[in-house]
Amino acid sequence: MPHFNASGILVPSIASTKKPSNSQTTRQRGWMPALVGAAVITTLLLIGGLVLAVAWPSVTNGFRRAAQSRDLQNMETIAQALNAYSDRYGTYPPPVVLDANGTPLYSWRVLILPFMGNEVLYKRFELSKPWNSPANQSLLNQMPSEFASSNSPDAAGTYETNYVLLTGPGTLFPTTGPLSRTQAEKNTILLVETNNMCSWTQPGDINIGRGLRVGQKPMVDVGGLHQGSFTAITTDEDGLRIPSDVPQAVLDALVTPDGGENVDVSTFVE
């Protein structure tokens, strides 16, 4: 009940002036570190997210370039073998080996095996028989790793290739017969990437008679393994990363061995 002193003034009760207990004070003090810790963690997460958002395009671009570099290494090995064949025999190999009746037998890839260090495998082929004859088909699983892209996971398992020649009028491989490396002007494309669809010994390249296109169709369009660009290699064994939206005139000029076009490929070079 209320308590008054001798002068009639209300005196506060003991209960109303009671200090907080030690346990209450401890709990109150314990909230502060927790709040500060939560604020610090939230800030760090926000900063980390911002850094990742800024850096991620560079990271993904690095992954893409590394993937393309692996393809270009494969293509350089193949180009070296093609050039060695040209130096030995005077021209590049025919895209398709034909029998006496004009029947397609097998691909140029079989012919360059000795120049890739695979002479033993080459000697196992029955060169008078087609690629899908029982004896030759049994060698499909001996495909050199350079013929398949690591960026096309099913290629190695199906023994299908990702690297092809460009054939047809105005190329290094016209219908009249293959040219030699000495007949090609600088920056002439020798080999390009494509989505796989044919076995490595099977005759199969991209004929540009209907026009050269960048796209996703296997063995028809150039490219398909990489986003935004495709890989190619020249007769000089220079690796190129060519944008998918390259002007058609530039693409056509890169294919022509003797067109006289002056094409700046400095931004494409590996």
Per-segment meaning from a language model:
Residues 1-24:
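N-terminal intrinsically disordered, acidic low-complexity segments at the extreme N-terminus
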Residues 80, 107-108, 142-144, 158-160, ...:
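Short, solvent-exposed loop/turn segments at the edges of secondary structure
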Residues 167-270:
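Hydrophobic alpha-helical interface faces used for helix-helix packing
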Residues 153-156, 195-197:
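Solvent-exposed loop/turn segments at secondary-structure junctions
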Residues 92-93, 125, 131, 163, ...:
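Short clusters of hydrophobic/aromatic residues that line enzyme substrate/ligand-binding pockets
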Residues 25-47:
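N-terminal Sec-pathway targeting helices
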Residues 5, 99, 149, 167, ...:
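Acidic surface patches and DE-rich sequence motifs
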Residues 49-142, 146, 152-155, 182-186, ...:
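Conserved hydrophobic/amphipathic alpha-helical signal-anchor segments
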